[in-house]
């Protein structure tokens, strides 16, 4: 017979439901459940005396007849598509259904069939997000990949060949030889990966060669000479082959000013890296491009958010990363021209306005590969504390702000780089690259990372213990990170030209390949979910003050951040 229980008891048993609120880690961000797909009284839950048992919540349906491979029960989804409670069904490494799981023979409204061949992951009281996408990677060392995975990232895009000096400074893999060797190495890594070729050339042939060799994007970097001619040529080749172009512009303004670079774009779509400028770019006003409709602006995480320590740490980082010498006055002047508190403070606010669309790392090259997610939510928290409620919020919650910020490391880089058909959000048909979180540790320490529907990483206790939880508890690779499961669970993103030319067979790799698509004129700033603002941005050349649509953008540096020392005592 039906029974009534309190909201608190229900949340304790099945997790929060419609109207309940959840605090994210130790931030001041509070989400409210917008919808619950369950049928009250028919919830499924695994365990002794629970519902997912033979003849109850578990049906007799085989996998061949439609039962899912895995069900994640009663998870609170935080995604650009909504903040809702649902069961998630996975099949063949992709999201098969979202809604109500169970046994259709005994329960109403079931659209996710649980059968004898179904594994269960308990999502009660947990948060589920899409895996993160870091689109600004210097592949300096392979150990970055495990660090990124353990933080909740499931896709990395960038360039490099290891600790070569070109890679230490620039995110590109130059030439078909290096692209081939890097792709061959990817069979060892549980991570979706895409490579950017070097885009700095004034004639098309070398760039076309790299795209056909497997580059899924091209990178223009000032250390290789980002001249107007190189910009124009690279964008023309990208338009012909449907790959994205990322740009790090000319800090020293040697080959032109920001206006010359904008003119070289000719209105074509481009992804502008560290658009504030501390990571590089026309000094002091590269930030202007964040207001253009054809520019997709991103940040790297060392400037996220602006704190009392930001300026001091940047100078030393820059000297190391760009092969500069503190004993050469010109090198010191170059470094100091890039680090401006005024533009970094404005960057915080432009993120909160939705004018900056993406947050990435700049791994080991003035950025921390394991902190993309942490720095994103620290920025969101700082902005809520300093700027208050966003005008777009409709309830007594931070749902809109949370969707705006999660888009910055999930769907927006996926759209920008032509892979949103496969990753970037929790939607039916997309890859089951998913991250489960305890709300108290949200954004800081994941509870489980799934790659292609297989558990690839998780915190795990002593393997010799009688239960999984005794110390030492730390992150360890799981079965999805070993053997042939790696190639079956993750993919390499390449150009359509490379895929159709049989690159996988030519290189003899096991990991599957997917082609990027719709990276050019079909997208732009307006394609950036919840982050499509195009204010007119001006920078005072003397004071570096930044204005958007005439309004001065400034904020105080944070002295204390959430998601920091409280979580990293050990």
Curated annotation (Swiss-Prot):
Residues that coordinate or bind Ni(2+) 1: 136, 138, 219, 362
Disulfide bonds: none
Cofactor(s) the protein requires to work: Ni cation
Alphabetically ordered keywords of this record: Cytoplasm, Hydrolase, Metal-binding, Nickel
Modification after translation, per record: Carboxylation allows a single lysine to coordinate two nickel ions.
Biological process (GO), any one: urea catabolic process
N6-carboxylysine carried by residues: 219
Localization annotation: Cytoplasm
GO molecular function: nickel cation binding; urease activity
Residue ranges of domain Urease in the record: 131-570
Cytoplasm recorded as keyword: yes
Subcellular location, principal: cytoplasm
Binding site for substrate: 221
Cofactor: binding comment: Binds 2 nickel ions per subunit.
Pathway(s) it belongs to: Nitrogen metabolism; urea degradation; CO(2) and NH(3) from urea (urease route): step 1/1
Catalysed reactions, as listed in the record: urea + 2 H2O + H(+) = hydrogencarbonate + 2 NH4(+)
Listed GO CC annotations: cytoplasm
Active-site residues, Swiss-Prot/TrEMBL: 322
EC number: 3.5.1.5
Binding sites annotated in the UniProt record for Ni(2+) 2: 219, 248, 274
Quaternary assembly: Heterotrimer of UreA (gamma), UreB (beta) and UreC (alpha) subunits. Three heterotrimers associate to form the active enzyme.
Similarity field: Belongs to the metallo-dependent hydrolases superfamily. Urease alpha subunit family.
Listed name of the protein: Urease subunit alpha
